[in-house]
Amino acid sequence: MATINQLVRKPRAKQVVKSNVPALEACPQKRGVCTRVYTTTPKKPNSALRKVCRVRLTNGFEVTSYIGGEGHNLQEHSVVLIRGGRVKDLPGVRYHTVRGALDCAGVNDRKKGRSKYGVKRPKS
């Protein structure tokens, strides 16, 4: 335990909290342009072709963003909105593309969990 005199001379150091999504710079989402759209394979024990894209953000960062849902319409030069949220089995992927915003269309024929995939309410 430090004495009061020691604390007066050298106060306690504040703990620095490291962000999991530094490219967002404390914003909820950021806009960017796709520089490359491709598929990649997850780490063991999973197996798939995960759809991802490299995005150059408006603040100059270049990040890898996951494209959720079945099928997408993204290609190079598409303007997308990204949010935080990593993909556990893809190392280096710490962002998600927001479906149904800007150039990224919502998922076709999606009936459940629509809000996460940018789908409007179907006509009954």
UniProtKB/Swiss-Prot annotation:
GO biological process: one example: translation
Family from the record: Belongs to the universal ribosomal protein uS12 family.
HAMAP family assigned: Ribosomal_uS12_B (MF_00403_B)
Gene3D superfamilies, sorted: Nucleic acid-binding proteins
UniProt keyword annotation of GTP-binding present: no
Residues bearing the modification 3-methylthioaspartic acid: 89
Species whose genome carries this gene: Aliivibrio fischeri (strain ATCC 700601 / ES114) (Vibrio fischeri)
InterPro entries to which the protein is assigned, alphabetical: NA-bd_OB-fold, Ribosomal_uS12, Ribosomal_uS12_bac
The keyword Ribonucleoprotein is assigned to this record: yes
Subunit field text: Part of the 30S ribosomal subunit. Contacts proteins S8 and S17. May interact with IF1 in the 30S initiation complex.
GO cellular component, one term: small ribosomal subunit
Annotated keywords: Methylation, Ribonucleoprotein, Ribosomal protein, RNA-binding, rRNA-binding, tRNA-binding
Molecular-function GO terms, alphabetical: rRNA binding; structural constituent of ribosome; tRNA binding
Function in brief: With S4 and S5 plays an important role in translational accuracy.
Protein name: Small ribosomal subunit protein uS12
